[in-house]
Amino acid sequence: MSCSCGSSCGCGSSCKCGKKYPDLEETSTAAQPTVVLGVAPEKKAAPEFVEAAAESGEAAHGCSCGSGCKCDPCNC
């Protein structure tokens, strides 16, 4: 059974499950070079911010991308 969990579940760029705007799909016919203009050291987030972000994300809604690009569990 397939499920679309809506905007509360985003399963990544290669997955159609739960996209906010499913009609807007990124397509490209030509290879575009990536240009990096500057380099900076990686910023580390404080542990309390990482924990708060994990609690408020998709996992808090009980929705993640399962096998076959379906929302798992399908409780939307």
Curated annotation (Swiss-Prot):
This chain's function reads: Metallothioneins have a high content of cysteine residues that bind various heavy metals.
The species this protein belongs to is Zea mays (Maize)
Which PANTHER family does the protein's record reference? Answer: METALLOTHIONEIN-LIKE PROTEIN 1A (PTHR33543:SF15), METALLOTHIONEIN-LIKE PROTEIN 2A (PTHR33543)
Give the family, as the similarity comment puts it: Belongs to the metallothionein superfamily. Type 15 family.
GO terms for MF: metal ion binding
Q: Which UniProt keywords apply?
A: Metal-binding, Metal-thiolate cluster
Q: What is this protein called?
A: Metallothionein-like protein 1
| One Pfam family from the record | Metallothio_2
Concerning InterPro entries, the annotation shows: Metalthion_15p
